[in-house]
Amino acid sequence: MIASGADTQSDALVRQSAKVQFGDYQANGIMAAAKKLGRNPREFAQQVIEQLDLSEIAEKIEIAGPGFINLFLDKNWLAEQISLAVNDDKLGIQATETQTVVADYSSPNVAKEMHVGHLRSTIIGDAVVRTLEFLGNKVIRANHVGDWGTQFGMLIAYLEKVENESASEMELSDLEAFYRAAKEHYDSDPVFAEKARNYVVKLQSGDEYCRTMWKKLVDITMQQNQHNYDRLNVTLTEKDVMGESLYNPMLSDIVADLKQQGLAVEDEGAFVVYLDEFKNKEGEPMGVIVQKKDGGFLYTTTDIAAAKYRYETLKADRALVFSDTRQSQHMQQAWLITRKAGYVPDSFQLEHKNFGMMLGKDGKPFKTRTGGTVKLADLLDEAVERATQLIQEKSTALSAQEKAAVIEAVAIGSVKYADLSKNRTTDYVFDWDNMLSFEGNTAPYMQYAYTRIRSIFNRSELNEQDLSESPVVLSNEKERLLAIKLLQFEEAIQIVAKEGTPHVLCTYLYELAGVFSSFYEHCPILNNEDEQIKRSRLKLALLTEKTLKQGLDLLGIKTVDKM
């Protein structure tokens, strides 16, 4: 387009065609570019085509309607790409990305059990992280745990009160009971509250006893959390913890610098940054507190420090934060102050990957029957119970060991896929029946689609090595459509990496399973008398199997060979 006179800002808007009669891909940006140039769109489209050299890729290029360019891919080129992809460990996808990306996700609180509210951040973040790494990025996981604040003064003071300093022997459920009791004392006993506040000061000033107790609380919590991460097949480890305490020593200097720059001003004893970009109810610039009048700091101050640290110390090109949509304004304000203060350059990408809420069938936030918060471990236990019942009914031919593997894969996979398959920015309804169904866009359906293709090779006398030199021949439209869909895997994961939207990959995998099903129905494989066609179709099946497995792995969902 540029060679035809369009400016460098013009986008060809090449998209997959919605209907086969419009080709495989369609360039939709011609009319907008022609309008800017004051040219006839169809004439401009013709000029663009003359500048293109797609002779090896497209068998036909045509102009449609007022100026769309339709591309029909060449089947020999498609066959060649399939052959390259099926023999490649990365399915033909080149590792072209070399950015350093910090991903801040999961972020539970210390001295509390993980609950369903942590599920979305944990699994959405992990799917995006896996995808970024697959594409060649260096990813630094940052588990921004809540490991600082007044609650630690309360806990240490209460543990001391009940003469139980052996925190390392406690289960986290005990810690939660301690937390509730400590909070009751804090609210009702002024002497206890004063002691708790003193312990916070001691902790912040590095008191050895307080630091030791604090470290015990953190370690117990993270051991319990690691058990949840392992069950969820999430890649976070204790090495990825970058809690609030990491940034605490930086906060005084940041506030001092904001004051020196004239960004933070005193207001009733607190220090506030006023932002013209945000207005309060009176239409005046909104004030964002960075230091309270008692000298304490806020989450905003910590998030400014985190952004600065991720750029200066971790040398990142991009920082992603996976948290609730309700934190959107907070993140925007923290990052706006970060940029105004000059802590990061414009080239440093700060991206809030926000998500909606998990709702019950009643449309309200997901709770226990008694209205309490659902613990993540309890949710996963229930998933295993329900999957056990389902698999016992359906998989009678499996050994006990095989059955156990299927149950775990289906149970955890169902919970994760039900979430990941929804656009993260929307709320979604948590429904056991839907997520454990073998029909529709669900984990069991996708896992079963994978095992069905595995079974083809179990029945075949040919293995992957036997097929390595066999050519791919696309002799009919079903084969051709499957080949195109297989090569669109890279497009799907590029979107996930850029936008942080795993549902795009889920949709792609579900569509791929559907296209394969149609291919399998109309194109005999194992009983085909033409050996070349048989081998070619086996290669298409093999690449489909590999793509489903790799795609589900990027989502953190396990596959099994038998179901």
Curated annotation (Swiss-Prot):
Catalytic activity: tRNA(Arg) + L-arginine + ATP = L-arginyl-tRNA(Arg) + AMP + diphosphate
First-tier enzyme category under EC: ligase
Compartments where located: Cytoplasm
Recorded GO CC terms: cytoplasm
Enzyme Commission code(s) on record: 6.1.1.19
Keywords: Aminoacyl-tRNA synthetase, ATP-binding, Cytoplasm, Ligase, Nucleotide-binding, Protein biosynthesis
Transmembrane spans: none
InterPro entries on file: aa-tRNA-synth_I_CS, Arg-tRNA-ligase, Arg-tRNA-synth_N, Arg-tRNA-synth_N_sf, ArgRS_core, DALR_anticod-bd, Rossmann-like_a/b/a_fold, tRNAsynth_Ia_anticodon-bd
Superkingdom in the source lineage: Bacteria
Main subcellular location: cytoplasm
A Pfam family the protein falls into: tRNA-synt_1d
Residue numbers covered by motif 'HIGH' region: 108-118
SUPFAM superfamilies: Anticodon-binding domain of a subclass of class I aminoacyl-tRNA synthetases, Arginyl-tRNA synthetase (ArgRS), N-terminal 'additional' domain, Nucleotidylyl transferase
GO molecular function list: arginine-tRNA ligase activity; ATP binding
GO biological process: arginyl-tRNA aminoacylation
Assembly with partners or alone: Monomer.
Protein family (similarity comment): Belongs to the class-I aminoacyl-tRNA synthetase family.
Protein name as it appears in the record: Arginine--tRNA ligase
